[in-house]
Amino acid sequence: MKHSTLAWRQTLASLPMVGLIYGLTLVLGLLVALPMYSTLTTEDQRSLTFLNLLHGFDYTVVSDFMNRSGAAVKAVFGLVRWLNLTYLFLTVFLTGGILLRFAQLSSLRARPAGMVSQFRAELFWDGCSQYVGRLFRLFGVTLLFVLVTAVIWLIIGILVGSAVSSSETERETIGVSLVFFALFALTTTLLLCIGDFAKIILFRDDAHGAFRAFGQAGRLVLRNLPRTYGLYLVFILIGTGCFALYFVLESLLTVDGWLMIAVLFVVQQVLIASRVTLKVWWLGTAYSLVQSLPQPVRQVSAPVTSTLSTESAKEDC
């Protein structure tokens, strides 16, 4: 708990960084939202039929519109695939800068009270660019393990399903499928948790071996499951709770005009900002945990608060 509390204070001290990341996310969203809005306003031909959608989903209206203007809309949807790839790249790219920020704050904790470490964008971008290559290799390693476990669970699920399908009812077959899906979900989240801790190890040791860092992180997580994976699941539940709250609010709001559309937009942006904050908070918590937990493998190089974070600490002092 103390690591989460410390990381939360450091996250609050890094609100300019959180705002920068949120701004980049907003820009990416607008790159699709604006063309989509332009396409819809052009293709609707000022039809009043679309007003029916304010009172709830109307399949007939949507189906007629897609039959008439599906090609134009699908062209915009093609941008979504590129947006997802860009967002994925941005997520990996920004990780180095986020970790550098927490390393900077951790190295300056011994300063006199009242002194604060100012966020500097140029140092943040330097951290992003310095670690992006090795973090992408680590992303590839994590994805490889996720795909392998997915194939393994799929094969086991098919074998078990075919063995019980002849003797069990449809409901029981679905139950077996849900059990294997839950096992796959737990395995995947465990691998993603290990991947996040591997990022910290790569950063801390200034290392380049993605497989080696993943192995070290795996041993670290498995030896401290409640403090690592357990806490990771708590953060997932917090994020899930935020989405559930949004859907509850959306169901309660009657979107019947521009005012309510604006209110819903604000609620959505608050949700996105909270998701960004939660991601930064988790990385800070994981960084603090790695610094405090006993290491399963003897470190090869000196612990890194990175040349960049060391230089920034000297400048702040």
Residue spans for each PLM region:
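Alpha-helical membrane-spanning segments of integral membrane proteins, especially the hydrophobic core
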Residues: 73-88, 119-150, 171-185
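Juxtamembrane transition segments at transmembrane-helix termini in multipass membrane proteins
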Residues: 2-71, 94, 175-209, 225-317
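Membrane-interface interhelical connector segments
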Residues: 160-176, 207-214
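Membrane-helix interface motif
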Residues: 38-43, 150-166, 249-253
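Polar-ligand-bearing catalytic/cofactor-coordination segments
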Residues: 102-103, 215, 314-317
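Hydrophobic transmembrane alpha-helix segments characteristic of membrane transport
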Residues: 92-129
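Short membrane-interface loop/juxtamembrane segments of multi-pass integral membrane proteins
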Residues: 64-69, 123-131, 216-224
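Loop-to-transmembrane boundary segments
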Residues: 129-141, 221-234
